[in-house]
Amino acid sequence: MKEPSIVVKGARAHNLKDIDIELPKNKLIVMTGLSGSGKSSLAFDTIYAEGQRRYVESLSAYARQFLGQMDKPDVDTIEGLSPAISIDQKTTSKNPRSTVATVTEIYDYIRLLYARVGKPYCPNHNIEIESQTVQQMVDRIMELEARTKIQLLAPVIAHRKGSHEKLIEDIGKKGYVRLRIDGEIVDVNDVPTLDKNKNHTIEVVVDRLVVKDGIETRLADSIETALELSEGQLTVDVIDGEDLKFSESHACPICGFSIGELEPRMFSFNSPFGACPTCDGLGQKLTVDVDLVVPDKDKTLNEGAIEPWIPTSSDFYPTLLKRVCEVYKINMDKPFKKLTERQRDILLYGSGDKEIEFTFTQRQGGTRKRTMVFEGVVPNISRRFHESPSEYTREMMSKYMTELPCETCHGKRLSREALSVYVGGLNIGEVVEYSISQALNYYKNINLSEQDQAIANQILKEIISRLTFLNNVGLEYLTLNRASGTLSGGEAQRIRLATQIGSRLTGVLYVLDEPSIGLHQRDNDRLINTLKEMRDLGNTLIVVEHDDDTMRAADYLVDIGPGAGEHGGQIVSSGTPQKVMKDKKSLTGQYLSGKKRIEVPEYRRPASDRKISIRGARSNNLKGVDVDIPLSIMTVVTGVSGSGKSSLVNEVLYKSLAQKINKSKVKPGLYDKIEGIDQLDKIIDIDQSPIGRTPRSNPATYTGVFDDIRDVFAQTNEAKIRGYQKGRFSFNVKGGRCEACKGDGIIKIEMHFLPDVYVPCEVCDGKRYNRETLEVTYKGKNIADILEMTVEEATQFFENIPKIKRKLQTLVDVGLGYVTLGQQATTLSGGEAQRVKLASELHKRSTGKSIYILDEPTTGLHVDDISRLLKVLNRLVENGDTVVIIEHNLDVIKTADYIIDLGPEGGSGGGTIVATGTPEDIAQTKSSYTGKYLKEVLERDKQNTEDK
């Protein structure tokens, strides 16, 4: 019987050239090939898109309107498709409320655990809270000041959706006259219609009393009635005071601290029932940061030490500052750090109630006298940020503010009540501060009573199972409260992978995009085993991947190419990894078999005395690290995932240099001092973020070559006759562009319930320019024709214009010859965007004082692309510049001049320097995981060289 398979016929998405391919089902299939060869076009834009479209088509029209219309991919037929799930890197939630624990649903089970077996403790007296009797409630109320007016309320609905008409009617029938609905007292016969889609709180007014001697009996009767109505809950509305909450279940006998019935939503920071009231469950508050207000404490007040009050068009604040200094005898020519603590406090936090009189010049001319209390710079910024109606003012003030942990919950996000409940000696805020490996160990060994163990058994099983999956995909160093928005693409993808394994689905087609990104070689085996486990459940996995180990572990390998863009889009080779390795046409096969490889450099540039010295780096998990980064060579920072590489390079090195060199407002991670910055004049962070957020940005505009091309068109005879200047050939301004589409070339049609549809502009035919502009040609081509050329074609077309050719050649050098000059920035992959940025740096004149920082530049790159990238990076170093790279890829690590290896483990087990030196030095360091794998690679390369 024939093995089941997925049969694709006539795939033409993007650059695919009418591909026919048969893929075995229930196998681990890896698709590889050069960057831009068409891997994602086949895996995501054809196979996954059709699987998803067919599933959506099977739903009702009502459901489809919320999911959106899915276009049919450009393919003739696909047979044997299963329901498809895509696990890519673009769907990371940036919501500040989303954490590792919430995304993986572990937090839901932890909340349930605390609600079922949690023990509440009084935060004031640290004693377990027991249930309250009616007598205890009476005694507590009688402690209120005499003549205090109170209302006894029975909460019958607590923050639930619905119109609740039947309930209100029943309350009226029982003889109750008043209700408190969402904080407002209303007559039971006069209740407005409640919005059924909103949450409401309804409390019955059981009695209204004035606190005085002799009311105890009536009070006790009314409390019993209220408790009966609301299943053991009581709210006392103290007129002109705060509500008191009582429960038959929990309250402190000493101070009366009481807590409602334990339920899961009480432990949710996304619910008003559980969230900290100060920060609304975010754990952080935007607070004025004195270090941003006074960035350089060596400056005097006259030199502009207080940055937000540096003179602008109005001299209001400078005049006020001068007057304050006169009144309090503060020397304005003394460095800020040498002022007394009292003087600094007056400037920053105000002068109390003392009024100050001063005269200032108004913007429109003329002077004005003011008498006011000096509030201080910090309260002034805070007030203007929170109260100003001007968006511009709020934006300006926010530059001097930082997210700091909330003072009430200390960053734990939850209310005081929620944090008073303990399981196994920890509250829920403490548990989520654990890393995944620590949490797994804690829950496996948790100590519960026999009764609690019986209740918690099933919940613990779910928690342990999910933590185990996360541990198995190499994420043991992540803390449960880590914000999703701070995860790398690879981490977010592996979290989704672990969640999918937890669902234990079978018969599904999973399409993954480079799951090994950001993963150290040490953890690769665990990831591959996870993929095999998913396959063994009866699923088909299509993985777009360049990782050597993953390709070798595949059941079926597909090499797409042979080149990129127009030169790709074909199946070069497919079959088992062994079959592909024997195929001489397959570039991937040649690298896998060792016939081709990235060579170890014949010599390494020695580290000179010129260096950046970082002392006492303590950002995130760094443990007071001291490290030197040599200048004018290529340094690679290595270490297992979570060891502190990004903390050292991005948080400390980059942000501190950006602050000093670029006068950036970013706040670097903690460190004691950094020396050697004066040897640099430029810092460039070449990351994988888009080169532009709109379709108007493209490689030609980003690299600046489009300016030169427009100059060429403005110099043509036709342009001179017509009086066209350079601006005529821009699609961003009026004049030469098509006004029907405003130079976009496409028109957006809003479809309301369906997704917006983009269609080519009928007036300009998608060419972006008006007819008159397109009549101007250079060598037979108009400006729109130029934008449609690939970089390679344009390089030949402009070969006689050195200025243009030089810039275009840098794009070819970084492997982007296949990209069109006008390709929308939004359609470039992260790796392509990064290489466009590199190209734009390559054609600039070097001073030899620049430092380039790259974070995993090999993401999305084939070995052949990496070889090209390394040549480009070495060109930068040959100019005398410095390159610092965070990388796991051994081909990059082995070609480094100098390595800084962090670790030894991830998370709390990392944050120290394991070894520094050349790759050969690291390979001899037994305590280095990187060294272990590097040694194997260096020995294998040496062996291959000798064999030749």
From Swiss-Prot:
Record keyword Zinc-finger present: yes
InterPro entries: ABC_transporter-like_ATP-bd (IPR003439), ABC_transporter-like_CS (IPR017871), P-loop_NTPase (IPR027417), UvrA (IPR004602), UvrA_DNA-bd (IPR041552), UvrA_inter (IPR041102)
ABC transporter domain sequence ranges: 309-587, 607-935
Biological process annotations from GO: nucleotide-excision repair; SOS response
Residues annotated as binding ATP: 33-40, 639-646
GO molecular function: ATP binding; ATP hydrolysis activity; DNA binding; excinuclease ABC activity; zinc ion binding
Keywords, ordered alphabetically: ATP-binding, Cytoplasm, DNA damage, DNA excision, DNA repair, DNA-binding, Excision nuclease, Metal-binding, Nucleotide-binding, Repeat, SOS response, Zinc, Zinc-finger
Entry superkingdom: Bacteria
Zn-finger segments (C4-type): 252-279, 738-764
Task of the protein: The UvrABC repair system catalyzes the recognition and processing of DNA lesions. UvrA is an ATPase and a DNA-binding protein. A damage recognition complex composed of 2 UvrA and 2 UvrB subunits scans DNA for abnormalities. When the presence of a lesion has been verified by UvrB, the UvrA molecules dissociate.
Subunit record text: Forms a heterotetramer with UvrB during the search for lesions.
Protein name, entry field: UvrABC system protein A
Species this chain originates from: Staphylococcus aureus (strain MRSA252)
Lineage of the species this protein comes from: Bacteria, Bacillati, Bacillota, Bacilli, Bacillales
Gene that encodes it: uvrA
